[in-house]
């Protein structure tokens, strides 16, 4: 997320974190690879004035999920949600673009980057097809275990001083539960490599066993340092709240949460 798009309170927290070596907002992909076009049809781009600034995940036909710090302090009427994108520098016929009707948050604390999740209601309903689909979410409390292989993704920069790619990037990561507060964040590392998420467009999904288990939130110690884990908001801790928002606003999940054994609730 560009500094000019942050609220003064969030910006102050980020600068202090950088100075002290603490958490800083994420997340660009460092050390990843280009994703196959539309391999992740639930991936969304949050944009202002035609420019991408954060990722998001389609969780119902008229709702996306993202990081709270992405929209903290923003006039939501300036935000557009783009579905079905792959190459942001091309005019793609696969895209569906929506304005924001309403934003729901759940006690976001910008100073500690806690509860870094928002649900964004679109001004219309997405057309579900091969390029635009609803993500699978975990059931409440059914988080991801230690050493689970996952996939992070985003359109952010390839490094702190490198430009952003035009096409969606993906990165294999591994969950490390002993390096963060389990019910507060999902943390990941890339074993034996300097790779990970970085400053820029947060809000993108962490996919583990075909479920979106995390929302890109913050980093410590620099981009892809290999020393500190990257942190994601834990979707499983908010699953009941997410479902209540969707159900109370006259839409429904197209695919229902599943438990660890794959059973539909």
Curated annotation (Swiss-Prot):
Question: Which keywords describe this protein according to UniProt?
Answer: Disulfide bond, Glycoprotein, Hydrolase, Protease, Serine protease, Signal
Q: Give me the disulphide-bonded residues.
A: 54-70, 150-208, 180-187, 198-223
Instruction: State the deletion phenotype.
Output: Knockout mice are more easily killed by wild-type E.coli, but the knockout has no visible killing effect on E.coli deleted for outer membrane protein A (ompA). Reduced fibrin formation in response to FeCl(3)-induced vessel injury.
Q: What class of enzyme is it?
A: hydrolase
Q: What's a single GO BP term from this record?
A: positive regulation of interleukin-8 production
A single GO cellular-component term on record? cytoplasm
Q: Where is the active site?
A: 69 (charge relay system), 116 (charge relay system), 202 (charge relay system)
Q: Give the enzyme's EC designation.
A: 3.4.21.37
Record keyword Hydrolase present: yes
What are this entry's molecular-function GO terms? cytokine binding; heparin binding; peptidase activity; protease binding; serine-type endopeptidase activity; transcription corepressor activity
In this chain the Peptidase S1 domain maps to 29-247
What this protein catalyses is: Hydrolysis of proteins, including elastin. Preferential cleavage: Val-|-Xaa > Ala-|-Xaa
- The residues that the database entry marks as glycosylated are 123, 172
* Coiled coil, from the record: none
Annotated signal sequence range? 1-26
Q: Please state which protein family the record places this protein in.
A: Belongs to the peptidase S1 family. Elastase subfamily.
Task: Tell me which PANTHER family the record gives.
Answer: CHYMOTRYPSIN-LIKE ELASTASE FAMILY MEMBER, NEUTROPHIL ELASTASE
- Note the subunit structure: Interacts with NOTCH2NL.
Query: What does this chain do?
Result: Serine protease that modifies the functions of natural killer cells, monocytes and granulocytes. Inhibits C5a-dependent neutrophil enzyme release and chemotaxis. Promotes blood coagulation. Through the activation of the platelet fibrinogen receptor integrin alpha-IIb/beta-3, potentiates platelet aggregation induced by a threshold concentration of cathepsin G (CTSG). Cleaves and thus inactivates tissue factor pathway inhibitor (TFPI). Capable of killing E.coli; probably digests outer membrane protein A (ompA) in E.coli.
Q: What is this protein called?
A: Neutrophil elastase
Q: From which organism does this entry originate?
A: Mus musculus
